[in-house]
Amino acid sequence: MAARPLPVSPARALLLALAGALLAPCEARGVSLWNQGRADEVVSASVGSGDLWIPVKSFDSKNHPEVLNIRLQRESKELIINLERNEGLIASSFTETHYLQDGTDVSLARNYTVILGHCYYHGHVRGYSDSAVSLSTCSGLRGLIVFENESYVLEPMKSATNRYKLFPAKKLKSVRGSCGSHHNTPNLAAKNVFPPPSQTWARRHKRETLKATKYVELVIVADNREFQRQGKDLEKVKQRLIEIANHVDKFYRPLNIRIVLVGVEVWNDMDKCSVSQDPFTSLHEFLDWRKMKLLPRKSHDNAQLVSGVYFQGTTIGMAPIMSMCTADQSGGIVMDHSDNPLGAAVTLAHELGHNFGMNHDTLDRGCSCQMAVEKGGCIMNASTGYPFPMVFSSCSRKDLETSLEKGMGVCLFNLPEVRESFGGQKCGNRFVEEGEECDCGEPEECMNRCCNATTCTLKPDAVCAHGLCCEDCQLKPAGTACRDSSNSCDLPEFCTGASPHCPANVYLHDGHSCQDVDGYCYNGICQTHEQQCVTLWGPGAKPAPGICFERVNSAGDPYGNCGKVSKSSFAKCEMRDAKCGKIQCQGGASRPVIGTNAVSIETNIPLQQGGRILCRGTHVYLGDDMPDPGLVLAGTKCADGKICLNRQCQNISVFGVHECAMQCHGRGVCNNRKNCHCEAHWAPPFCDKFGFGGSTDSGPIRQADNQGLTIGILVTILCLLAAGFVVYLKRKTLIRLLFTNKKTTIEKLRCVRPSRPPRGFQPCQAHLGHLGKGLMRKPPDSYPPKDNPRRLLQCQNVDISRPLNGLNVPQPQSTQRVLPPLHRAPRAPSVPARPLPAKPALRQAQGTCKPNPPQKPLPADPLARTTRLTHALARTPGQWETGLRLAPLRPAPQYPHQVPRSTHTAYIK
């Protein structure tokens, strides 16, 4: 298929397509016209858009536009390339470092490099959806163009200002090299290292880690030999290193990984560590220098050395596998084997893949690659050359997923600080810079409903637009888990309630005991001999007895050693360090399960008491770019309180974990930043006060507490509502019980007449009058004392049961008459609860019983009460209804009419 022509009408385009299919079979098969010539294509370049195109003569070193359209044209063929400046490539903390003659380092901040301008672009070929472009305009147009499954290199011609060479990448001058590993070693350091998590957590963590963008804060170092090969031009070397990073960033974008360059360093005076043709020695020397010198002065995740030294054999790079984010192994070395920076970029991407846990793509793995082998294949091929690979295979993606799920790359989830992108601030570059509330890209590509793509501001009612702690344009509550722990040595992170971003990943301090595993944490991973045996030999494998480690690893040969001294010599293990050399196992599969080039090394050791012990080791025919997978991994427990470090069994006290844990008062653990991660209900930083748990690094643990508090409040509210509803329904009954039935002290002592007399009720005025007369005729000495009014009222309760009939009761002579004082009578028992008998004799007998005294004293004026009683007796029936009511609560006894009144007198005793 030819390059897309200038825009034409749809009908004409259809006719041209049909004619092309009939007359140009080779083009119909997808073979580009740009690839049919044997010699390099010489093209002219121009910039512009539409019908206005200006020839490219040179670019101003200080002015590189944010968006650039380039047209490459030769005769009737043309390519239009749409480019955007790769704003996220260089962090705001980016520094350039070189050295003076006396060895003093000079670090220049971003404000210096902005003078040179940001001249690194990513883009695509117009009309080709699967195309990819990575170019630099620092010194003319230079870079990589991929379309129609072909890779092309664009380079400026020395003899012309706007003439360029465009040729297939397979013609690029390069030294064909090999990573040297021809076996499949999937997940050597990762597979089965941890107990399998629950399926729910595995699915959730997989979605989170794969969906979230990972950021590798990278430092690239050029050794002295590279500086010399580039003509000792310091600026040229720096631009070359940044261009390499620009290509690598393009390679890793499909994996949702961004390469953020935080620094470049050039050893222009001398090498800062030993760099020789032995790649193994050079790698370890560089990693030691990074740990001791570079890390303390420059924070970063990974460092790569680009060397101008030609390594021995076919090795063009080397890196430890699954070592990303570690302090001692997160790095690699790369040989700059091509005139074009693309060659070193492909090798650096390969070695960085090893750091990510990716293994080589081999035939027995059945990997799927979008690019055919003759067109370059995939980046993790064991052997690389030309054409250069540009994509990752399905195996690489799977290895990366497995490594992330195992806890690798704990440092990759924090967004690097970006106050202002290198080269200037721009709305639409997907980086939230100073003064911006959000940035979702250009308006035509923005899919974020919380962000205004035109102004990079939040929409109305939106609080946030990006981040794991932002949901539906609102901040998640404090204590919401945003990143769970991935293994027994990892710590969870929680939203703070104030930021849309999840806190940076933290893990247990090195030397901390693993949870539920007999081992110690190291770089956020729990390593044990048993897990490594399962990795090498499959399920059922276990570590061999200690005598196997001691006998085999004391040999100092390829099958038993404590690491390499050089490329061809091995170190013997001391007795105390034997469990830090080649791992020895028992059981498992009949042969190693890590790859086709791994063989079993079996050793029989006789015992003094008879018999033999079978020790099984592993030897892998490696290249030179990867360490021996049969060696015990760093951080593995080798004795109680000791772990393997640098092939030596060392005490965990070297990490200072106990001193760090003491400040947590036994209510928390120490994380890798030497801060306390407190239990729930205890507050950081020292877990000595009540709080919400967590740490100053990972946010508060409040999710469970919030749920409990919310549930408690809801239950309380529901109970109150239910109680209020019941009260409302029973309000009349409650009011009657609480208010209408209450009596005062005096009212409780009074006899209240029933409001409605029972059936058959007879007025009792006659009886009351009869009794009243008797009382009048009673001798004075028979009455109770004047100062004791209780007898009168109690006797009234006993005998005066009903009002008297006013017709039969004679009216008293005077209402002012006062009854004579009553003498104290003998105490009588309580009044019977049933009516008195009809016979007078029985009534008289019952009168001898003395009733119980009242529970509360009567008022202090009995005389006045007696007077009122007399007045009440003299009232008429009409007056009686409204007067003082002295009727008892029980019905009055029925007296027979035939009882003579003259012969009976009721005595009140």
Swiss-Prot record:
Disintegrin domain mapped to chain residues: 424-510
UniProt KW Cell membrane keyword: yes
Domain called EGF-like: residue spans: 656-688
Signal peptide: 1-28
Chain sites annotated for binding Zn(2+): 179, 350, 354, 360
Co-factor binding details: Binds 1 zinc ion per subunit.
Keywords: Cell adhesion, Cell membrane, Cleavage on pair of basic residues, Disulfide bond, EGF-like domain, Glycoprotein, Hydrolase, Membrane, Metal-binding, Metalloprotease, Phosphoprotein, Protease, Secreted, SH3-binding, Signal, Transmembrane, Transmembrane helix, Zinc, Zymogen
Modified sites of kind Phosphotyrosine: 907
Residue window of motif Cysteine switch: 177-184
Active site: 351
Protein modification: The precursor is cleaved by a furin endopeptidase.
Reported impact of residue 301 to H: In a breast cancer sample; somatic mutation
GO terms for MF: metal ion binding; metalloendopeptidase activity; metallopeptidase activity; SH3 domain binding
Residues of this chain annotated as glycosylated in UniProt: 111, 149, 381, 452, 651
Cofactor(s) annotated in UniProt: Zn(2+)
Region feature (Disordered): 822-862
EC number in record: 3.4.24.-
Alphabetical GO biological process terms: cell adhesion; myoblast fusion; positive regulation of angiogenesis; proteolysis
Residue ranges the record assigns to the propeptide: 29-207
Extracellular side, ranges: 208-708
Assembly, per entry: Interacts with alpha-actinin-2 and with syndecans. Interacts with SH3PXD2A. Interacts with FST3. Interacts with RACK1; the interaction is required for PKC-dependent translocation of ADAM12 to the cell membrane.
Name of protein: Disintegrin and metalloproteinase domain-containing protein 12
Gene that encodes the chain: ADAM12
